[in-house]
């Protein structure tokens, strides 16, 4: 300002400058007013924006919280979805298994239907078989009743025939003992005659007696053998012929075809009684030595050995025939007398042969075993060219028969004892037809 007002006076301002200053002040005031108003507006906007920011922050916090909750929900939903998928997989596998079971059940159903049809056919067939079996059962019941009737009939017939056999056995025994008595009387008479002849003859006639007595010894042996063979050889065949002549043993109404039904009898009736020949042989073969009387307590059927010691009695087993035969235990006194006579005959024959043997060995000087005196040396006619009497030979043969087999009785007894040791059923099959 100093430059402009150099040629002016001091203290004085120009009007232009003043106007300009005024204009500048006005402009500045207007600017200040506009700026202040604008500043106020901006502050209001800032306050509004701060309020909006606060609201957005609150909304943001709420949104974040909501977002976190939604994320949790999403996680839970994901877990549920995974679980559902796993459950779906399990259910699908179960469904497949059920479908497989359903198919198998269908197959089993078809098989069961087929089996039911087969079983129905089998049931029908079994019903038919049951009806047939019932008919067969009824038929067999009828047969059983017929068999029972036949059994009772056969039992009665067996009892009757066994009674008839018992009667015939009693008759045959009586005949047999009468024959034994006759033979015993005849033998005693012959023995008395021989004793009388021996006593009447002198010692000078020994040579004649050597020829006569051995001729009588075979007769005695033959009589004893005939007496012993009669109960075994002639006793039972005669009974058989009598039974076979009658055919049905006094029952004409019985057919011969009924004999084939004997195998159908029960085992108790199948065992036939012991044959009569066995019973007679056991009664007649019992030997009693001389010089020893029977004790009163000893039964008549007890056997006595050759040494004089009583042996064990051989008893026949009990049988239905023996129980049915009345009076089977007959008196055995004639039989005991016959045995005593037989033993006496044997003793006399043995004494005679001992005497004859001593004389024979004195003449020929042939040794004899002293331990086996009963067995003579074998005959050999070329030793020393010494002739022998025919009567001596026959006496030796008769003596050997007496010592070896007792006239064949011991062999028969051994055969019968072997038969007794057999099974009674086998024995019955062999001898049942003989008894009938």
From Swiss-Prot:
Cell membrane listed as a keyword: no
Chain's gene name: GOLM2
Residue numbers on the Lumenal membrane side: 36-436
Modified residues (Phosphoserine): 233, 275, 328, 332, 366
Swiss-Prot/TrEMBL keywords: Acetylation, Coiled coil, Membrane, Phosphoprotein, Signal-anchor, Transmembrane, Transmembrane helix
PTM-bearing positions, type N-acetylmethionine: 1
Keyword Transmembrane helix: yes
Chain segments carrying region Disordered: 193-436
Segments passing through the bilayer: 15-35
Taxonomy of the source species: Eukaryota, Metazoa, Chordata, Craniata, Vertebrata
Family: Belongs to the GOLM family.
Protein name according to UniProt: Protein GOLM2
Ranges annotated as biased composition (Polar residues): 275-295, 305-321
Coiled-coil residue windows: 35-195
Organism: Pongo abelii (Sumatran orangutan)
Subcellular compartments: Membrane
Cytoplasmic side: 1-14
Basic and acidic residues bias: start-end ranges: 193-207, 224-247, 344-362, 426-436
Main location class: membrane
Membrane topology term: Single-pass type II membrane protein
One cellular-component annotation, GO: membrane
Signal peptide feature range: none
